[in-house]
């Protein structure tokens, strides 16, 4: 899929909900799994348009594949991209606040 043809729904795959990310939400930081072809500008535009918030900054990192085994078959998990989105003061994503 070409980078220009990604819609906002293609960019944000799912929110990452862990104990650490729940604590980061108090600091206005939200963590998403994003498309591997996306960049900081695309993630910022997608979050701002889908959740009606203002984004202060976006940090992106690639998560390396981990080795996995299923019996005698060996393989690796897929690599994926993680985005930490920091919102401007006074903004929260209400859709994700109730998630446990």
Swiss-Prot record:
One of its GO terms (molecular function) is structural constituent of ribosome. It comes from the Bacteria. Keywords: Ribonucleoprotein, Ribosomal protein, RNA-binding, rRNA-binding. Coiled coil: none annotated. GO terms for cellular component: ribonucleoprotein complex; ribosome. InterPro entries: Nucleotide-bd_a/b_plait_sf (IPR012677), Ribosomal_uL23-like (IPR013025), Ribosomal_uL23/eL15/eS24_sf (IPR012678), Ribosomal_uL23_CS (IPR001014). It holds the Pfam family Ribosomal_L23. PROSITE patterns: RIBOSOMAL_L23. Transmembrane segments: none annotated. GO terms for biological process: translation. One of the early assembly proteins it binds 23S rRNA. One of the proteins that surrounds the polypeptide exit tunnel on the outside of the ribosome. Forms the main docking site for trigger factor binding to the ribosome. Part of the 50S ribosomal subunit. Contacts protein L29, and trigger factor when it is bound to the ribosome. NCBIfam families: PRK05738.2-4. Belongs to the universal ribosomal protein uL23 family. This is Large ribosomal subunit protein uL23. It comes from Pseudothermotoga lettingae (strain ATCC BAA-301 / DSM 14385 / NBRC 107922 / TMO) (Thermotoga lettingae). The gene is rplW.
